[in-house]
Amino acid sequence: INMATSHLSLIIPVYNRPNEVEELLDSLTRQSETNFEVVIVEDGSKETCQHVVEAFKDKLDVSYSYIPNGGPGNARNYGAKQSKGDYLIVLDSDCILPPDYIKSVNKELKETGADAFGGPDKASDSFTDVQKAINYSMTSFFTTGGIRGGKKKMDKFYPRSFNMGIRKSTYEALGGFSPMRFGEDIEFQYPPIQERQQSMPVSLGLGISQETYGLAQVLPPGL
């Protein structure tokens, strides 16, 4: 694989969150590098985002699928089967990507050839004190050991599914995500880490969820 030009597949499971999908897709139209496709998988939603996806088809290489509700792991596996990329990047629907996110991924893959990678999310300076406190409790090494994917680490690095990438051949060798509805990302990450495949933190800051923090933000990479 040519790491400089590897095609990336962004896999995004969605459940009843069309507004978040619109913000995420809008951030993807602003990427400085465009060697990616977007695979949206609607996980049995009653409030679908199909109309949102259709509005972006002239701006992005984006596909939409609707499947019966089976949980995020099942939706990610379905999306992976539809994908064409050399690498899969798994995102939550509430992410907002900084303009150089894809550029940063390409740079890290070219330099390291990592099998798996990931990065943190972070609160914006404009967040309220309560929103910042929630973010700190979920990302600080003092509270969780950096469980949500901080760049530095106290122990082994386990990318999390809100901002996680993996070589597609590695994903296939592992058999995909578990159908369990919670913790499937950590269970998925355990085998490659134990087998010493290269998994590394990548400095890729994301915007914060409207649903979780009450305000969507765009953050530059490296925060």
Please give the residue ranges for each predicted region:
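Glycine-rich, basic loop-to-helix element that forms the pyrophosphate-binding segment
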Residues: 67-83, 104, 158-162
